[in-house]
Amino acid sequence: MGPRARPALFFLILLRTVAAQGRPPRSHSLRYLFMGASERDHGLPLFEALGYVDDELFVAYNHESRRAESRAQWVLGEAHSQLWLQLSQSLKGWDHMFIVDFWTIMDNHNHSKESHTLQVILGCEVQEDNSTRGFWMYGYDGQDHLEFCPETLDWRAAESRALTTKLEWEVNKIRAKQNRAYLERDCPEQLQWLLELGRGVLDQQVPPLVKVTHHVASAVTTLRCQALNFYPQNITMRWLKDRKPVDVKDAESKDVLPSGDGTYQSWVALAVPPGEEQRYTCQVEHPGLDQPLTATWEPSLSNTLVTGVISGIAVCVIIFLIGILFRILRKRQASRGAMGDYVLAECE
C-alpha cells in the first residue's frame, strides 16, 4: 500500500469506527480530522485539518494558508463572527500542537531522517439526553498509535512503540486537563452553535427506502435487506425470524456509506433455508420513521408470471398427450370391435 493510501485508509476506518460506536438514532457529532506528512512526497502538507458536523464537511484549514475556510453554505455568513474567529484560533493552535507532536513521535521512533505521516481525529458526540462522549486519537503511518482517556487523563498506547510518547505526555497534566476541557465543554458548545447554524439542513430527516431481495448461489439462499437514500446516517437494521431477533453473528452487514447525493445507504444479509423465506422479516429503525419499518421478501410478479406460464404450458402438454393417447386407445378398441362382428357373421 502506497504512502498516500495509508492516511486515507486510516481515516476511513476511524470515520466508520466512531460513527458505529453505539450512536443513538438522534445523536449529533463534531469531528476534526488532522493529517500531515514530514515530506512532500506523500502528497500532503505539513498540517491539514477538516471539520465535520454529522459527517457534513463545514471547514478546512492548512498550514500554508493558516486560516479557516468554510466548506458549507450554511456557515458562509459566519466568517466574521466571534465563534468563527474562536474556531480559527483553535485550528491555528492545533496546527502548532500537531507539528510539535509529530516531531516528538518521530524522535521517539528514531525516524527523523525518513518520511512519515501523522493522523489525528478528535471531537465529541452529544446524545438526545444531552450526555456527551469525547474522543482524541492519534495514528502514525496509518496505524493506531495513541488514544486520550479523558476520565483518567491518561493515554492508551495501541502499540509498544507508542509507550515512550505515552509516558512523556502523561507527565504534562496541564495539557491533559486542557484536552479534557475541550472534549467535555468546548466541543459540545461548538457543536450546539453549529447545529443552530445548520438548522433546516443538518436536522432534516429523510426516511429510508427499504426492499428485500432474494439470491441463490451455490445452493445457498440469501435474503438481502437494503436501506437506500436516507438521512441522517444513524440507522439500525436487523433480521427477525418468526418476529424474534436473529443473532447478529448470523447476519452479514455493510457499513453505512454515502450515496453521493447527500443521503446514505446500507444493507444486511442473511442466509436462510430454502422454502423458509417468508419466516424472515427485516426491521429498520431511523429518525425519519415514526415507528420501526418491516419488510419481507415477495416473489416478483415477473417470476410468478413465468412460473404460471410454465405450469400452464406443462398442463396443456399433459392434457394434449392424454388426449392423443385416449384417441389411440379408442381407435384400437373400435378396430377390435369391427373385427369381432365380421367373424360372427361368417359363422352364421
UniProtKB/Swiss-Prot annotation:
Glycans are attached at N110, N130, N234. One of its GO terms (cellular component) is external side of plasma membrane. The keyword Ribonucleoprotein does not apply. SMART domains: IGc1 (SM00407). Residues 23-114 are annotated as: Alpha-1. Pfam families: C1-set, MHC_I. Keywords: Cell membrane, Disulfide bond, Glycoprotein, Ion transport, Iron, Iron transport, Membrane, Signal, Transmembrane, Transmembrane helix, Transport. It is a single-pass type I membrane protein. InterPro entries: Ig-like_dom, Ig-like_dom_sf, Ig-like_fold, Ig/MHC_CS, Ig_C1-set, MHC_class-I_related, MHC_I-like_Ag-recog, MHC_I-like_Ag-recog_sf. It is found in: Cell membrane. Residues 206-297 are annotated as: Alpha-3. The chain crosses the membrane at residues 307-330. Residues 23-306 are extracellular. Residues 115-205 are annotated as: Alpha-2. Residues 331-348 are cytoplasmic. Residues 298-306 are annotated as: Connecting peptide. One of its GO terms (biological process) is iron ion transport. Disulfide bonds join C124-C187, C225-C282. One of its GO terms (molecular function) is transferrin receptor binding. Residues 1-22 form the signal peptide. Residues 207-296 form the Ig-like C1-type domain. Binds to transferrin receptor (TFR) and reduces its affinity for iron-loaded transferrin. Binds TFR through the extracellular domain in a pH-dependent manner. Belongs to the MHC class I family. This is Hereditary hemochromatosis protein homolog. It comes from Rhinoceros unicornis.
